[in-house]
Amino acid sequence: MPFFDPSARFTRSICNRGGVMSFKIAIIGAGSVGFTKKLFTDLLCVPEFRDIEVALTDISQHNLDMIRAILDKIVEANGFPVKVTAHTDRRRALEGAKYIISCVRVGGLEAYADDIRIPLKYGIDQCVGDTICAGGILYGQRNIPVILDFCKDIREVAAPGAKFLNYANPMAMNTWAAIEYGKVDTVGLCHGVQHGAEQIAEILGAKSLADLDYICSGINHQTWFIDLRLNGRKIGKEELVAAFEAHPVFSQQEKLRIDVLKRFGVYSTESNGHLSEYLPWYRKRPEEIARWIDMSDWIHGETGGYLRHSTETRNWFETEFPQFLASAAKPIDPAKRSNEHASHILEALETGRVYRGHFNVKNNGVISNLPADAIIESPGFVDRFGINMVSGITLPEACAATCMASINVQRMSVHAAVTGDIDLLKLAVLHDPLVGAVATPEEVWQMVDEMVVAQAGWLPQYADAVPAAKERLATSTVKTRDWAGAARRNVRSIEELRAEKMALKKAV
């Protein structure tokens, strides 16, 4: 990682009364209301950050108005001098910003529905579809041109040396594009490691998460607990398998992850549903999908589960907004600060308090048996000198092989997104592990044509390729199917959601 001159940081962060700092943070895609609220309250848990400026930007004025109202309520309730602004003009929001956080979803739920729906016609059943597989690759094609626009704005109007914190999926592809082509100081952030650690602490009976020490390494959504210790005692494969299989809930919800643990010898940080679509073995036939997933919650493998969840969440928030707004008028409780990395990284960079986490960066030798150009997720420490990665890590061979399959897909996908090369895009999809386990080359070629045509409005780099794709689709002989997937659930109505929430309250 690059060495940062600490004096440059001090000149840009003005210290006011009592050590309180004044600098600007911009949040792109701030219309992701729940996540933006969490980031904001986390930031205000840092005592020195209560005089900062937070500039929100989104293409939706409606969403901006909602999140601005919520954040204003928080500021008012706590009496902090924080300044909150909202802009549909992104460059205005980024002007002078020292830190830029992105949580965008280009195309929204409309395009996301195509990421799930169209591959199902070719037998490809995804739970999430936001990392690789057919849906994740097309998601990256939509996001990367916009990410590069963000980077251009950062270079031109943000503070000199501004840092870009990317939360948006597909994490590795977006971060790869920002570093390689956007030429901006970028780190990718995800919470998968933290969630996996919480599970392990629970099954091992740890009194506190602090009793658990671990090293996770790999790539985003395919990171592995390669060293695990409880109160200094090393935890091996057999003990971990036995603990998971004895747990009444995780033994059912994480069947696939437990099977991978048995075979690979290490536990994956990612959820059962996520992991199932990065591997070629568990979602290739309907009966296999039913065998390995759990329907108690979308994240355990439901077909299109995250799309359903996201749709219900959006509808619920729109309907219940007055209640969300009223609940925002509460004092900040630092004890409830989340484990999302962003606020902890900024605190370490600005105050020098050291923070340890797992970050997505360009490899450059951090993991010895993965390519130097890949975006890896691995441990690092943050202080005033920047993000400093722990180097010299070697993954178990099976983990490295699985990561390599995804890295090759990611590299082709990024290059295709930047160049608008539809043939390279098709090759990227063809080499995806799950796609390759299910679909023939002819099916992949037609599926990509269909997805590019359906999403043409969000894919400007493929404008010249769309007419020919339409012509091929008009004369195609590849058969498709009308299939909802192996484990699909309908989107619940507001009334159904309200009834379920009431029932849960009564049951407590």
Tell me what each language-model feature is.
Residues 3-20:
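Short, Lys/Arg-enriched N-terminal segments with co-localized hydrophobic residues
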Residues 48-72:
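NAD(P)-binding Rossmann-fold cofactor-contacting core
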Residues 110-181:
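Rossmann-fold NAD(P)-binding glycine/threonine-rich loop
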Residues 25-54:
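N-terminal Rossmann-like dinucleotide-binding module
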Residues 72-76, 156, 176-186, 202-206, ...:
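Short, surface-exposed basic-aromatic patches at helix termini and helix-loop junctions that form
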Residues 83-96:
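Short acidic low-complexity segments
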Residues 205-505:
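Long, compositionally biased stretches enriched for glycine and/or charged residues
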Residues 150-231:
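Internal, well-ordered domain-core segments that constitute the primary functional module
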